[in-house]
Amino acid sequence: MLSIMATLAASLLTAAPAQAVDDPGLALGNFELRPIGNKAELQGRVDKLNADLPNIGVNSILKADARQGTWSSGVCNAAAVESGTKPENFTRSFCFDDADNGNANSEWWPQGVTTVADADEDQTWGDPEAGWNPADHKPMMVTWYNKDDWNGDKKPDDADADGLNTERKGVRVSFIDSSTGKYAHVLLVYPFINSSGNASYMSVRTSQHYSSSQYNYGSLHAGGIVWYGYYLYVADTNRGFRVFDLRNIIDLGALPAEKWGTSKTAIGRQDGVYHAHGYRYILPQSDGWTNTACDTVEPPPGTPCDMQDNDKTCQANDVTPKTSFAGLDRSSSVRHITTGEWCEKAQVTDAYTTGRVIRRPMNASGGTPKLDANGYWAADEAYRIPYNTSYTDNGGIQGAAVINGTYYLSQSRGMSNGRLIVARPDTGTGRLVETSPRRLSAIGVEDLSVWPGSPNQLWTVTEHPGKRMLFSVTP
């Protein structure tokens, strides 16, 4: 098998980029993203919040007396791997504190990973200050979604340990100091104008309105994140991306004590007091990119994007993709964000149930997408995720990273160690084809992010309560 893989790998490395034409599920027109229809309105709401509330920067958050995690040159959480194992080419790990490592009742589950190496080519953020050198405090970020449907009835109404009215807390992002291990959570929020005409905000959900629908619009899954320039691109499974500008981070803790509500059961402005489910920092959405079926995140009930994440299928005739994960590629001549679809374990008889990966170009500066003549963010490559009959489990991909045309895919496998899959595009079939045996990873691996260097590093995070670990491997 290895000799066959080597021969195939050599042929793929010399193949000229092209797009397969015989697979309708890979037609690039399926994957264009449009700017959300209410961008100007959203920005106006954010401006009102910024006028009312104090802002704070990334480094100021890292300087604060926050939570304390642990860096290790070994596996910092033995429960994150099967007994006696370690991810292949392992380099370093980070463990959250005991509360965030979680237990059987954990409400927050980690998903997406990005770092300052995505954000800026020099891999630092901000300018030196007295007693603070940004080169010694390089930030990393991890998204977490609020698990609000424990019984699987597609109704995000299951109260957590904080009591009533705590469902649908949405998404938080951990800002992590890659040197000290200090970290803090920032709650992502969606701004709106309340009935009194004041700027307020709610949690980030699959749709940003209340409804009696069976779906009830649960917390956004946020399975991927890319930090590029000042912007965070957070995966919206059924649309594309929610976009957050880091210049808009708000520090509720800097308000007078009577204005900051620390209750974990409330969010938004209520009677002149600002709540955020107990969190100090919030970051409001200011922009977004959406597929052609959904032009806003405030749609009337019943539109194509009024569904929970797992309602989109993974079939041969799929058109509109899921955006389950995301990663930045700085190695290509034009920078790209690579997204892809999580699909459950593929059936052994169906090579089309593994999902797809899609690449969209980014501008070299400004942190913005590279748009076509119509103002759309169009894809220029798309491929089927590997289907390899040498293995009984295909699909289950939770993250993708690309370095010099080689794709690295993180595959979760329940409570067994996951795998890192290495593949190259076969442009004749439109499918990624594996070029080496699958590599041992950890339990519950998620999104991937590249930290360029000598050597390069691939970062991922494991999601299961009690088994959580942020770690890197060399590709």
Regions found by a protein language model. Give the residues of each.
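Structural signature of eukaryotic scaffold interfaces centered on beta-propeller domains
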Residues: 105-137, 217-228, 312-336, 393-404, ...
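Beta-propeller blade signature
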Residues: 161-179, 244-269, 349-370, 418-430, ...
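Loop/turn-rich, solvent-exposed surfaces of beta-rich toroidal or solenoidal domains
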Residues: 138-140, 327-441
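Surface-exposed loop and turn segments in beta-propeller and other repeat-based domains
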Residues: 50-106, 181-216, 256-319, 367-393, ...
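Short loop/turn segments immediately following the C-termini of beta-strands
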Residues: 143-147, 237-238, 246, 340-344, ...
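Blade-level signature of beta-propeller repeat domains, shared across WD40, Kelch, NHL, RCC1
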Residues: 445-475
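Beta-strand-rich domains and repeat architectures in extracellular enzymes and scaffolds
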Residues: 32-162
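Secretory targeting and sorting signals
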Residues: 1-20
